[in-house]
Every structure is written in structure tokens, then in C-alpha cells.
Amino acid sequence: MNPSTTQARVVVDELIRGGVRDVVLCPGSRNAPLAFALQDADRSGRIRLHVRIDERTAGYLAIGLAIGAGAPVCVAMTSGTAVANLGPAVVEANYARVPLIVLSANRPYELLGTGANQTMEQLGYFGTQVRASISLGLAEDAPERTSALNATWRSATCRVLAAATGARTANAGPVHFDIPLREPLVPDPEPLGAVTPPGRPAGKPWTYTPPVTFDQPLDIDLSVDTVVISGHGAGVHPNLAALPTVAEPTAPRSGDNPLHPLALPLLRPQQVIMLGRPTLHRPVSVLLADAEVPVFALTTGPRWPDVSGNSQATGTRAVTTGAPRPAWLDRCAAMNRHAIAAVREQLAAHPLTTGLHVAAAVSHALRPGDQLVLGASNPVRDVALAGLDTRGIRVRSNRGVAGIDGTVSTAIGAALAYEGAHERTGSPDSPPRTIALIGDLTFVHDSSGLLIGPTEPIPRSLTIVVSNDNGGGIFELLEQGDPRFSDVSSRIFGTPHDVDVGALCRAYHVESRQIEVDELGPTLDQPGAGMRVLEVKADRSSLRQLHAAIKAAL
């Protein structure tokens, strides 16, 4: 067995021992030893391998798999620009704290700076965006040192896993694992009985790292009129379940007192408990920045949770005293009902179909056990405004840096992970539904994510709903959408594209239909085999008018 083959097999074996069950592989020559080792592991049922030709979509597929499974996922590629194409996914994984392992092959380091083909200084390329940049030295053709090299390689792989999962830091995130490989890059003919240098007995990792606990209790008096703001990455806090809570769609639903974000300006809370990292609603940002309202920030990680500079204290969990006033709870419940009614009434009265109408229809069609993946622009905001009840529903969205890139691939990865978990614990004949709601720009931006080869795992029940208003609808609601700029904003912010969504899907052999918004519910209830796209035409020119009408109705 040649040195590169041996090293690759050891690394793959140790990754599996450390909990990796899915790997995304992009083709290349330099990473051939890793590719052969991964294919062997896939054939033996130890991992599920997903082959993609585009590293950009591969990175987001890995993110979807990781957030769907709650486990580390590797994406493997060759050297050069293949590594650079992981940049956006690495940044998202950093801020969303996703255990993404970038497993890159490299040329031998002595070739750096010599003009060697497809060679660049890729170790350290991701800088501060990764939890660690770890390299293995070149494998040596030294049979007498096999045991020592095996220990070194396995220990380094365990270090990668610990950094990615946050086992020693409580801060999961991306890791760059760079492996220089020397030719030969393909396996040699092997003598009978050739074996990979062994790991620990019973399939255990070489170096076990128990997860660290991160516990900072914070005393909070609940007799003061309090609202909870629950954002992305929020933990579950049962002792706060009785409080009125503005929960973003990706936040866990832990109480029976939801509070619509548009109800906040109608209330005068005396303090705020912030969970996770809120990213969506302007009324929330205004409240958190109010110097007259103390903010207590509870997070699950080490990042500083205070955008406005107004937090009075930070911790990880609340130690509560007192109880909320019944009159305060009643007032919040009434304002919540009022805000939901205002949105629904204005949606019914509005003469045109908008993205908010599409989001409301999707929200109404969901049922317990579904998984919902939301685009990072208007869709995630719209389902919140539509009053989505997330009980029994898993909601995913790339909120780390909230880019629209990679959303199709993220949805595919999340669907594959969710279905895989269901197959292991439930009935494999009835896969759970994953529904993705995204805008047309988000869809077009990552349309190459639809490319899944005929030999690759494909979701069994994924519906991608494309709310198509032919451009960037969110800008209609921002300063750029002010009528003063109407002569230029449509082109430079709205970016109309006139893409034929159906033709694009046909090019990738993906089923698609264009339907009306009132057909969404019945169509989603129809069982779909595999992956399909439902396109709903929407209008963005009246979005500003609709939102103004909702605000006036409040």
C-alpha cells in the first residue's frame, strides 16, 4: 500500500470513528487517494457519499447535511481554486456555528512558489473564518514507522473533529484540514491480507474528547413586565415559557405565548430577555437599542451578544424569581391577536399576489413533522409576519451571515439528512416532507445545486417553492425602494432577470410546475416522489403599499 493511500484510508477511518456519516466529494486528481478511500467507505456502508462537480454548491450541501443531522460533515476537494470556492460556505458555517470540515488535498509543500501547476498557499487561506487550520505532513514510505505515523495521523484527525464540533470550546464551526499528497495518487495492487493501520478497539476514536459545558447562570426577576426575543441559535429555556416571546422562525418554540414582531411597538416592556442572535425584524432592533429598557442576553456560545451596546448582563441560562403579571400577559396576548389579524385582513384585501401571500399559504399548508427551509431574504421574514406556528416543525435557514447563496443546496442537504434520520428510526417507506420557500433570485443564484448525478443520493420528498417576483423584492421595503429612486432602483436593486424557471428545471431533469397561490396547499398535500419545484408568480411593485397598509391597520 503506497503512503498516500495509507494516509487517506487512516484519515477517513478516523473521521468515521469521530461521528462523520456524510461526505461531499468534488472530483480532482490530487485528492484521488481521499476519493478512493471515501468510495470504499461508502460501499461498505460506513458513510454516505455525495459527489458534486461544483465546490460552491458542495459546501452548502454539506452545511445542509450538518444542520439537518446535527453532526460534522466533510467536503473534500482537490488543490487550488477548488479550495477557494468553499469561501462563502466557510463564512456561513463560521457565524452559524456549523461543524463543516474542509478536507483539501494539496501539492507537496516544497512546490509552493515554484510555478507548479494548480498550486497555491492554501493552508491558512480561510484565516479567521475557521476554528483551526490543520495540516498533515507528507506520508513517508517508511514501513518501520507505520505505527508512529498512524498515531500522528489519527491524533490530528481527532483534533480536527474536536475543533469542528466545539468539544473543547463549546463553539462549533468550520475547520480546514489540508493534506499534501505525493504521487502515486492511486492504490497499488495489494498483496492478499493488506490492511489499513488499525485504530482503537471497538471502533472508538483515537483520542476521545468529552464535550465541555458552558454554563453562566443569570438572575432575572420575571415580575417586571418582560418580553423574550428569541433569535437564531437560541437554546431551549423552559423556565421562560410563560413569557410573551417574539421567536424568529429558526428559534425553538418553547412556550404558549407567542408575540408577533409587529406587536412590539404597541407594548411598553420594562425589560427584555434576548436568546441567541436576532437578525430579522426592525421593531426588535429598535427595542433592543432602547436605553430605557434593560436587556439580558442568554446565548449558547462565546460570541458577544450585544449589537446595540445595550445589554445589561450576559449568560447562558436564567435563574428566575417572581412571576409575570397576569395583566401584562393578557395585554401581550391581545396585541398578538391584533397584529395577526391586521396582517391577515390586509393580505385578503390586497388585490395582487405578493411574496407575503405565498409565505402565508406555505405556512398554512405545513403540518407537524415537516421540515421547512427558508431563503435568507424575504421568505424568512414573511413567514414570521404571516404568524407561522412552528410547533412540531423543524425550521432551517442560513442565518450565519444571511446570504442568499447556496440555499438550494442547503435545502437538498437538510432534506437528505432529515430523511436519513427518519429511515434509521421510523418507517423508510414514508419519508418526511421537506419544503423550501425561496425567492427567485435565491433560486437562480444556486440553480446549479439542482445538478445531482444519476448515481447520487437524492431527496425522496423535497418541494422547493419559488416565489417569483422577477427580482429582489426585499429592496422594495428598504430605503432603496423609496419612490424618489424609482427611475433607477428597479434596475440596480430589483435586478429583473426574466429567467424561465420551468426551462431551468427541465435542464436539470427536475419536475416543476407553475401554480397559483391558492393552489399551493392542495398541491403540497399531494405526495411527491423525489424533488420538485413549484413556481408561484408574485408581484413586488406593491409590496411597499401592502406593508404600509399593515402598519396603518395596527
UniProtKB/Swiss-Prot annotation:
The organism's place on the tree of life at top rank: Bacteria
CDD domains documented for this protein: TPP_PYR_MenD (cd07037), TPP_SHCHC_synthase (cd02009)
Keywords, ordered alphabetically: Magnesium, Manganese, Menaquinone biosynthesis, Metal-binding, Thiamine pyrophosphate, Transferase
SUPFAM superfamilies for this protein: Thiamin diphosphate-binding fold (THDP-binding)
Pathway: Quinol/quinone metabolism; 1,4-dihydroxy-2-naphthoate biosynthesis; 1,4-dihydroxy-2-naphthoate from chorismate: step 2/7; Quinol/quinone metabolism; menaquinone biosynthesis
Cofactor binding description: Binds 1 thiamine pyrophosphate per subunit.
Necessary cofactors: Mg(2+); Mn(2+); thiamine diphosphate
BP term (GO), one: menaquinone biosynthetic process
Enzyme class: transferase
Summary of subunit composition and partner proteins: Homodimer.
Note: Was identified as a high-confidence drug target.
Protein's name according to its UniProt entry: 2-succinyl-5-enolpyruvyl-6-hydroxy-3-cyclohexene-1-carboxylate synthase
Gene: menD
